[in-house]
């Protein structure tokens, strides 16, 4: 598993993608709930 030179592990891609999606969805719903989502 140490031969990842030039290749990004799928687990890392999945983790980053998951965090990004959860963060964006969380911010979107939080903004909408706070009343600031209409400006987006």
From Swiss-Prot:
TM segment ranges: 8-28
UniProt keyword terms in alphabetical order: Chloroplast, Membrane, Photosynthesis, Photosystem II, Plastid, Reaction center, Thylakoid, Transmembrane, Transmembrane helix
Lineage top rank: taxon: Eukaryota
Main location: plastid
Membrane topology: Single-pass membrane protein
Keyword Coiled coil: no
Cell compartments where the protein resides: Plastid, Chloroplast thylakoid membrane
BP GO annotations: photosynthesis
SUPFAM superfamilies, A to Z: Photosystem II reaction center protein J, PsbJ (SSF161021)
GO cellular component, one term: photosystem II reaction center
HAMAP family reported in the protein's UniProt record: PSII_PsbJ
NCBIfam families the UniProt entry points to: PRK02565.1
Similarity remark: Belongs to the PsbJ family.
Function: One of the components of the core complex of photosystem II (PSII). PSII is a light-driven water:plastoquinone oxidoreductase that uses light energy to abstract electrons from H(2)O, generating O(2) and a proton gradient subsequently used for ATP formation. It consists of a core antenna complex that captures photons, and an electron transfer chain that converts photonic excitation into a charge separation.
Complex and partners: PSII is composed of 1 copy each of membrane proteins PsbA, PsbB, PsbC, PsbD, PsbE, PsbF, PsbH, PsbI, PsbJ, PsbK, PsbL, PsbM, PsbT, PsbX, PsbY, PsbZ, Psb30/Ycf12, at least 3 peripheral proteins of the oxygen-evolving complex and a large number of cofactors. It forms dimeric complexes.
Protein name (Swiss-Prot/TrEMBL): Photosystem II reaction center protein J
Protein species of origin: Triticum aestivum (Wheat)
């Amino acid at each position: 598993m140490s031969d990842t030179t030039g290749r990004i592990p799928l687990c890392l891609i999945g983790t980053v993608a998951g965090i990004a999606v959860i963060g964006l969805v969380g911010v979107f719903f939080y903004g909408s709930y706070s009343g600031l989502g209409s400006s987006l």
